[in-house]
């Protein structure tokens, strides 16, 4: 299962990549810290899962990525990950098609749990 990370903090991105890369069947295939290159790379590579930070470099957001990519690639599972986890952000993410929204400060390990489940389902799916 291929995962693309959209995260502007290098330490967080590295932590996510290490955590997710240790999951059997999961491979982090790319990353971006800004919406524009993220959109371009996601549409070019069609990963199975995209983890999106809300606030990105250059004043862009994960919502920009979700709005641009989701209609063109509805098969990709998007999950938001942010320190800004208030209900309005969670609700907007859901309306835009994100499958989940995680608070970085309290739900970081939950990301791993969800990806483990997703990788197991992906491995069991017929080709």
Regions found by a protein language model. Give the residues of each.
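Short amphipathic alpha-helix used as the core "switch/output" element in two-component signaling
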Residues: 63-75
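Conserved phosphotransfer microenvironments
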Residues: 53-66
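Acidic, metal-coordinating helix/loop segments flanking the phosphotransfer/catalytic sites
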Residues: 31-49
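Two-component/phosphorelay signaling modules centered on CheY-like receiver
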Residues: 10-30
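Conserved acidic carboxylate
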Residues: 7
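Alpha4 helix (beta4-alpha4-beta5 surface) of REC/receiver domains from two-component response regulators
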Residues: 85-102, 106
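C-terminal output helix
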Residues: 88, 106-119
């Amino acid at each position: 299962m291929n995962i693309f990370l959209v995260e502007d903090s290098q330490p967080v991105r590295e932590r996510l990549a290490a955590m997710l890369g240790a999951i059997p069947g999961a491979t982090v295939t790319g990353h971006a810290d800004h919406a524009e290159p993220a959109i371009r790379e996601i549409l070019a590579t069609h990963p199975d899962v995209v983890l999106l930070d809300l606030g990105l470099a250059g004043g862009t957001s994960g919502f920009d990525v979700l709005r641009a990519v989701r209609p063109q690639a509805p098969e990709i599972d998007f999950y938001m990950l942010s320190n800004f986890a208030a209900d309005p952000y969670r609700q907007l993410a859901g309306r835009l098609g994100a499958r989940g929204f995680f608070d970085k400060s309290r739900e970081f390990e939950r990301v791993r749990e969800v990806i483990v489940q997703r990788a197991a389902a992906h491995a069991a799916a017929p080709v």
